[in-house]
Amino acid sequence: MVTQNKKILIITGSFGNGHLQVTNSVVNQLNEMNLKHLSVIEHDLFMEAHPILTSICKKYYINSFKYFRNSYKQFYYSRPEDVNKCFYKYYGLNKLINLLIKEKPDLILLTFPTPVMSVLTEQFNMNIPIATVMTDYRLHKNWVTPHSSRYYVATPDLKQEFVNVGVPEDIIKITGIPISEQFDEDIDTKVWMHKNHLDPNRPTILMSAGAFGVSKGFDVMISDILERSPETQIVMICGRNKELKRALRQQFKEYANVLILGYTHHMNEWMASSHLMVTKPGGITISEALARKIPMIFLDPAPGQELENAHYFQSKGMGKIADTTEEAIQLITELTQDENALAHMAEQMQDLKVKYPTYKLCRDLLHLLDHSSQFEEIYGKVPMYAKLFIK
């Protein structure tokens, strides 16, 4: 496998950490395979092509979940023909062409929805195979690139969605979403809980404050959960929000069943050791939770990929949507007092769990690479109005 020099170009994006995490998982897996004839390069296309404008767009994207939900909803659910007429389709085109001419890759791997790639495949002459890693659980039009060689998806349902829009069934592989291999490794959860001075036999709620991007309301939420379900224990991950961590630690310092943490490298251990997780339905987070079979409550998911992921997991019995904090507290109370309900949700997750997704994806990727042809020059034309946006 890969007996002659080959190069993979990974196109990613830094709109949220999920796409970068997928990229890192793939790169790390390929490195572990010790392929002497393979080189892998990665580029954040939009940031490199238009750093100032992309930075502004990233801030808008992050704030859209809190302040501009309706405008993001309108963009996400816009019709395909609306996107085709939009400059966004040509965003980063010139940078992408220059990258291909400079690097001469044997294969392009997309870990971020990149509509500009469709411009290359439809309006330019190009013989480079393109593979796409879908990082969510429902299809969005921006993930579809005409004349692609491969799509890697999370579930049979998502594969069928691609087939329904005309993608050939034989180029869609169900590999799961690439995550770290550690989420498939065995963990002694009793040892982990004792190490952190918690009771492994009590229902444990894992809450990730960093996923919500807000600092208020968690003190009341924790207090209400403990009042209604005093037998539970809570692990709160505050991420890099030092002020929130300090405030919560001060408020709950006398509670042996509340653990307040900052940024942690041990989400794997906490997911494996907890019984229920309150989080936002980002593609990577819920894939890690799926691997650990920890049921989830999705608190106020934003319109777009978050809400679509949440609806999918709820439809499969693996999670529940709470539109308000009060709804979330009520669901937590009901589930922590019903072991059978939690166990049933975990069983449902077993049916969709794919072990070692990154390894499976990389094995197929290398097979695809073996059949790639030699790089040829790229040429073509784009509409005149698009030339304003392709630098």
UniProtKB/Swiss-Prot annotation:
SUPFAM superfamilies per record: UDP-Glycosyltransferase/glycogen phosphorylase (SSF53756)
Catalytic activity, as annotated: a 1,2-diacyl-3-O-(beta-D-glucopyranosyl)-sn-glycerol + UDP-alpha-D-glucose = a 1,2-diacyl-3-O-(beta-D-Glc-(1->6)-beta-D-Glc)-sn-glycerol + UDP + H(+); a 1,2-diacyl-sn-glycerol + UDP-alpha-D-glucose = a 1,2-diacyl-3-O-(beta-D-glucopyranosyl)-sn-glycerol + UDP + H(+)
Any GO MF annotation of the entry: 1,2-diacylglycerol 3-glucosyltransferase activity
Principal location: membrane
Full protein name: Processive diacylglycerol beta-glucosyltransferase
Top-level lineage group: Bacteria
Stated family: Belongs to the glycosyltransferase 28 family. UgtP subfamily.
GO cellular component entries: plasma membrane
Matching Gene3D superfamilies: Glycogen Phosphorylase B (3.40.50.2000)
Its biological purpose: Processive glucosyltransferase involved in the biosynthesis of both the bilayer- and non-bilayer-forming membrane glucolipids. Is able to successively transfer two glucosyl residues to diacylglycerol (DAG), thereby catalyzing the formation of beta-monoglucosyl-DAG (3-O-(beta-D-glucopyranosyl)-1,2-diacyl-sn-glycerol) and beta-diglucosyl-DAG (3-O-(beta-D-glucopyranosyl-beta-(1->6)-D-glucopyranosyl)-1,2-diacyl-sn-glycerol). Beta-diglucosyl-DAG is the predominant glycolipid found in Bacillales and is also used as a membrane anchor for lipoteichoic acid (LTA).
Localization of this protein: Cell membrane
Pathway given in the UniProt record: Glycolipid metabolism; diglucosyl-diacylglycerol biosynthesis
Gene name per UniProt: ugtP
EC number: 2.4.1.315
Coiled-coil blocks: none
Enzyme class: transferase
GO BP terms, alphabetized: enterobacterial common antigen biosynthetic process; glycolipid biosynthetic process; lipoteichoic acid biosynthetic process
